A protein has these predicted regions:
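A sequence-level/structural motif corresponding to short, flexible coil/turn segments enriched
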Residues: 1-239
Length: 239
């Protein structure tokens, strides 16, 4: 098709071990990958129309849908799941906990289904965070955002199964019972959810220009490290 998804594995010396392809006749892309303790890989991104992941075929409900897929250490497709609705929906970040559950973030527009869980945007696009078990069953889905366009870009987990998300939002956005208001344009957010999908806290950073969080990582003490970009002057707490 136009663009296809690939997943590739190299050994520690940089030798190519295998490469796998997925997709269809339209535009399809992989955005993030994570590995569990058994060497299985988990991938998320988007696809349009009909896309094949090994013997599994998915068909999007609208312009583009989210996919979450699992491969074993030899590159065999184990399962592939889709989420989304009739508009544009993208998976941007994925992380795995010690039990093999996958956590995914990105954005959706309009009404989107994550297995049995349906979410409706508050505005142009909303952030989603969703959890699947090791067999690809949807466990929960949460949304955040407001009346404008809001995006989740990266997600990480700690040893207790909490997940941490970063991205950006504009104007007022709700993260559960927590409301944030951007300084003027887009601001960075960092949020923590527990293993059941409850929002524990959300923080913002930025200034009056465009600011965004693009990647997040967690250390063994539960500290989160975030990177992205800012323009002009930006505040990060008291710094």
């Amino acid at each position: 098709g136009q663009d296809d998804i690939f997943v590739a594995k190299l050994d520690s010396s940089g030798n190519w071990l295998w490469t796998k392809q997925a997709g269809g006749t339209n535009y399809d892309g992989g955005y993030s990958i994570a590995i569990d303790s058994y060497g299985n890989s988990y991938v998320t991104g988007y696809f349009r129309g009909t896309a094949s992941f090994g013997s599994t075929t998915l068909t999007s409900s609208g312009e583009s849908d989210i996919f979450v897929a699992k491969l074993d250490s030899s590159g065999n497709w184990l399962w592939a799941k889709k989420a989304g609705g009739t508009d544009y929906d993208y998976g941007y970040g994925i992380a795995i906990d010690s039990s093999g559950n996958s956590y995914v973030t990105g954005y959706f527009q309009g009404i989107a289904s994550f297995g049995p869980y349906y979410k409706t945007t508050s505005g142009g696009s909303d952030i989603f965070v969703t959890k699947l078990d090791g067999d690809g069953n949807w466990l929960w889905a949460k949304k955040a955002g407001g009346a404008y366009y809001d995006y989740g870009y990266s997600i990480a987990t700690d040893s207790s199964g909490n997940c941490y998300v970063t991205g950006y939002f504009k104007e007022t956005a709700s993260f559960g019972d927590i409301n944030l208001t951007s300084s003027e344009s887009y601001d960075i957010f960092v949020a923590k959810l527990d293993s059941s999908g409850n929002w524990l806290w959300t923080k913002q950073a930025g200034g009056t220009n465009y600011d965004g969080g693009y990647s997040i990582a967690i250390d063994s003490y539960g500290n989160s490290y975030v990177t992205g970009y800012f323009r002009g002057t930006a505040s990060f707490g008291s710094t």
